[in-house]
């Protein structure tokens, strides 16, 4: 223990050292006050409260990089939405989006991620997430679908998803889509500096239950920016005042997956990716990447 304490003292930055964030500024002019503020917080281990590691905090250059990736990502989602119509295959949408992203000098992050075979995820009706585009999956009137796209531009990642529908959809589907978007926005509003990640999930779950819907707990949001998936895991069903501390410079996704029926899901045994509601009920999801700021948060990708 004594050796560990001594190492921490030795490794502690001095005021005139370069800041750990990579900004090139002196520590005293950059993150010294930030670290002192976090040091003063008394974390409660019984609530799983932890401080965020420095490696997930973005500096100004990182934030600009994420924003540039987000411009392409937003354009890709716009294109995908324009293509949604009865008679088109989900593979056609995938291929068009792939070409769009590549033509802008970026890379579709989903492609080959842990073996995922396509460039985007398209999840229809009872598919919760990770639906694999296929030439055999043809959109028809009454379908609802989530299109999830992540773009990597020069090593910076922007992740977002939107809901779309084809023709006339059921009242249940309309309500699910609308309420799920509201749930995402409530979660984003709860993401405040020097509060905890659990506040997001508590807010999301409260609104979902009030509308008779359930929150998928097996999957959630994540840190995103300098890599596709970073800490922390962002649950959309948990207790407030728990988990990792949210601090300025963190970028995370808020992406509640909401089922019209029960929360249980199952993963396709054949493709290993497609996640469906276990009871066959409809599912919806909206997602934005946000930045925690000194005064609240800022949407980076939507």
Q: Where are these predicted regions, by residue range?
A:
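N-terminal cationic and glycine-rich segments that engage phosphates or anionic surfaces
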Residues: 2-6
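Active-site neighborhoods and metal-handling regions in enzymes and metal-associated proteins
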Residues: 10-16, 23-302
